Amino acid sequence: MSTGQTIYHSLLKLPLSVMVKSTPIPSNPIEDLNIDIERPIIYALPFRSHVDLLTLQKSAKELGLPDPLSPIEIDGVSYPRYVFTSIGPKMFDTDDDLPQESLDLFKIVLKHHADNPDADFQLIPTSILWGRRPGKEGTSRPHLMPLNGPQKFVTLIKAGRDSTVRISPVVSLRYMADNHGADDAIAHKLARVAKIHFSRQKLAASGPNLPNRQALFNRLLKSQAIEKVILEEARIRNVDVEKVRKEAMGIMEEIATNFSYSLIKNGNRILKWLWNRLYQGLNINNAATVRKLAQEGHEIVYVPCHRSHMDYLLLSYVLYHEGLVPPHIAAGINLNFFPAGPIFRRGGAFFIRRSFKGNRLYSTIFREYLAELFAKGYSVEYFSEGGRSRTGRLLQAKTGMLAMTVQAMLRGLNRPVTLVPVYIGYEHVMEVTTYAKELQGKRKEKENAGQVLRTLRKLRNFGQGYVNFGEPISLNHYLNEHAPNWSESINPIEPQKPEWMSPVVNGIANKMMTHINDAVAANALTLCATALLAARQRALSKEDLTEQLDCYLQLLRNIPYSNTATVPTQDAEALLEHAIALDKFVIEKDTLGEIISLDRNQSILMTYYRNNIIHLFALPSLIAKLVVQYRSISIDNVQAQIQQIYPFLKAELFLHYDESELNDVVSQHIDELVRQKLIERENDVLQLNATNILKVHLLAHTISETLQRYAIALTHLQASPKLGKNDLEEQSQIMAQRLSRLHGINAPEFFDKGVFGILFNTLKAEGYLNSDGVAVISKVEPFSRDMSRLLNPEIKLTIQAVMTKED
């Protein structure tokens, strides 16, 4: 570097230290992007800019990356550690050519790789984005615009403290040299690819141009689909067309978002304060997958689970901090109250009525609005379960929005549409007490400003929050596989509902929910809740609880549930101390040590957190339950019984294992339980290990309530084979409530009608009911007998007593 440049950089650093505050994305690039700091690194930037270079230097040093202004040695000669892909702006024009010094460096590096087979330099594309304000519809500025000196100065004043340093995945120059050669053409090709990459990166960060709201409404009113339904409604109602058109405009006003980047930017500061006040930390995983989809031009539809009203804010906040555009969010019309409604609307919410069946005008306008969002490239978010889960379990998917998404594809979208399942988890859900009251019969309180203020008064530290992005689902690939001729149904005007639509949408919905549960985040509270609720008196000594947590951690670490699930990195002792600090347990001391327990109210609330992760332990718990009940059981019998029960667990808990791989997975869990000395194996027979009897009983109890529900329903079917779905649900619910009261089962979902509904559907799908819904006794009877054997004696006696009374 010349002396002049050194002096110039020194002069720039002071004003930049005041004017610039940048956020690196990702926040931990060495780990997230697998950067090897032991291998040579060269940075590629889009434009020649000293300001960008110094901004990168500051971030690189903070992140533990090499200083871009430090030279790199190649064959004993020092060279710059950076290249620019274009000369960039001058005062009155822009030179888009690759700078000669960058071209020369590319050639030197590629030749070095050709001459040295062991060389493997890392090229890291890096761009500095000054602000993320989207453009306005009708403008044609490039997504990534070079700035001359005066423009850069103005930008620094406006957006210097709203800048991001975007660090992209490493490009291996060894790979480039081996596969593409080392001539001048490759250097130019690298520069061209980098320019496209940088432009897409900027689009992914700021999003498409925002429409003028009134122009959008006028455009929708002129669409053939809405115009047609307006004319038909006017004719059917025998009213003036203008009256219906005015009604249509009112519906658009009710639905449409009024997205404001200023609110997002300024609201981010408030949300940052809020999260710091509420949570000790936010844990975000797999965001790089989503960034990649955005940069590749996918239409992204976020489909998170729904635990709390906080989900709306949390996911938008996380996406903004991960360098992505906050999505347009489908929110229930119940949230459109003052002052929250207007704020949510400017934050990206568009509002949807709970039901609009039979309202053709509303349904057509909503469908056209959604199709417009997709066509313009705005990411969209809707909650897969429809409403918040009151039990902590993942609910069955509501398929209305998903069906409209597929219908939007049948309008002829020219970009791939991808669902991104999102698992959102908390160590404390603010509404959990309200949920428990609602499940016990209290009427749901309508959302209002007073409710918000009461919630704000309760703000305190709620432990950790978790946002895990699951495995994406390409709708194009899914349709190609399950409805190969789907493109024949494309119609740009009329909404289509071909024969394949319902089964395909149901299949996508099930896959979507399974991927959400795959991305589960186990945490200190969910694990402690699982252990304590399994204990007979909801109490364990501190030592026993620690050992049980360690048992769970070993299971989750040694047999990972999925590639997207996360497990705490701390040991059992640290997790327990963290959970105790959340102040949810009763802690008593005696001469033998500490006892940790749950009072009755907390026992009910803790079922919510256990239910977040119950699917993780479904199989190991079932294996333990079989061994506990049988005392001695062959592995073949274990495999056979699990094969019989598994379809019901899979449907209820969205487990991802195929039946074809089930035996292998069960074998892995058996091996792990034997390794932990929870059970013993001799000549392919499993039996209890007396030295670890408590641990295996606690593990077995996790699945017990689920098996009790199955036994209840099967007992009813066996006694009354012609019992219909509604009667089975009602009678099973009554018996479950009786069991709950008599045996202290505090889980509100134990007698949830919806869970029995899923069970009925699975019985039918698995052939336990014939086409008329009548029980096939030859199948139901042995299954009922097997389930009965897995019940504790007192539960079995209660079921028999209730059935005798009914007879």
Swiss-Prot record:
Chain location of the short sequence motif HXXXXD motif per the record: 305-310
Stated family: Belongs to the GPAT/DAPAT family.
The organism's taxonomic lineage, starting at the top: Bacteria, Pseudomonadati, Pseudomonadota, Gammaproteobacteria, Vibrionales
Alphabetized UniProt keyword annotations: Acyltransferase, Cell inner membrane, Cell membrane, Lipid biosynthesis, Lipid metabolism, Membrane, Phospholipid biosynthesis, Phospholipid metabolism, Transferase
SUPFAM superfamilies in the cross-refs: Glycerol-3-phosphate (1)-acyltransferase
Origin: domain of life: Bacteria
Predominant location: membrane
Gene Ontology CC terms: plasma membrane
Pathway: Phospholipid metabolism; CDP-diacylglycerol biosynthesis; CDP-diacylglycerol from sn-glycerol 3-phosphate: step 1/3
GO molecular function: glycerol-3-phosphate O-acyltransferase activity
Membrane topology type: Peripheral membrane protein
Keyword Protein biosynthesis: no
Chain's gene name: plsB
Keyword Lipid metabolism in annotation: yes
Entry protein name: Glycerol-3-phosphate acyltransferase
Compartments reported by the entry: Cell inner membrane
Transmembrane segment boundaries: none
NCBIfam families from the UniProt entry: plsB (TIGR03703), PRK04974.1 (NF003441)
Enzyme category, top tier: transferase
GO BP term, pick one: CDP-diacylglycerol biosynthetic process
Reaction catalyzed: sn-glycerol 3-phosphate + an acyl-CoA = a 1-acyl-sn-glycero-3-phosphate + CoA
EC number from the UniProt entry: 2.3.1.15
Domain remark in the UniProt entry: The HXXXXD motif is essential for acyltransferase activity and may constitute the binding site for the phosphate moiety of the glycerol-3-phosphate.
